[in-house]
């Protein structure tokens, strides 16, 4: 952990000019697999890591775009709940608590698309997502960025042994013993506005 703090993220701080855990100039991270063989879509990824109730305000102020900041936050809470806290539905028959909440708010607001939700709607999504996490896991959503990071790193390592990754390796003759690395990178945003994409 000390190496990640000092060497790994220390270099990212210098390059990006931002600080992980800062409420005014937050560095947000993506945490993803770095497997030896490409396994598209098989391994878990967490984006926008480092956001909490303070950092989201800093991101809104820094970018001048509150909607973008809160959209990033609600996406992160949902992704973290799915991947790290094991709330992802295991089958098509399982209810997705996050999608249920999104559908309920869209119905309340009489809109069809996520893009039609306002900043206040996205704030409400975050509140309801956190309540769903508490209800389903018995734990609060972690607000400490370092706790978020360790949870995400462990989850990506664990995803090497998820069912879809095991099946993909069998079909493509990829040895299980190769294992995976975990890449921790500064975020590049695809949802900042009309000029950004993924």
Language-model segment annotations:
Residues 11-198:
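Conserved mixed alpha/beta core segments that line enzyme active sites in large multi-domain catalysts
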Residues 2-13:
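Single conserved hydrophobic/aromatic residue that forms the stacking wall/gate
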């Amino acid at each position: 952990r000390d190496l990640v703090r000092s060497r790994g993220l220390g270099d990212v701080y210098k390059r990006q000019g931002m600080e992980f855990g800062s409420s005014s100039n937050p560095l947000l991270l993506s945490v993803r697999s770095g497997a030896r063989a490409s396994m598209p879509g098989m391994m878990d990824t967490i984006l926008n890591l480092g956001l909490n109730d303070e950092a989201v305000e800093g991101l809104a102020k820094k970018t001048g775009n509150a909607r973008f900041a809160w959209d990033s936050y609600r996406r992160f809470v949902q992704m973290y709940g799915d991947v790290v806290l094991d709330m992802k539905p295991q089958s098509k028959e399982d209810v997705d608590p996050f999608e249920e909440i999104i559908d309920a708010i869209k119905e309340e607001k009489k809109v069809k698309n996520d893009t039609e939700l306002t900043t206040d709607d996205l704030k409400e999504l975050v509140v309801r997502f956190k309540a769903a996490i508490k209800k389903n896991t018995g734990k609060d959503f972690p607000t400490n960025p370092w706790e978020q990071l360790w949870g995400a790193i462990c989850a990506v390592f664990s995803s090497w042994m998820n069912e879809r990754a095991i099946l993909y390796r069998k079909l493509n003759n990829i040895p299980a013993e190769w294992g995976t690395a975990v890449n921790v990178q500064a975020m590049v945003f695809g949802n900042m506005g009309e000029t950004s994409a993924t």
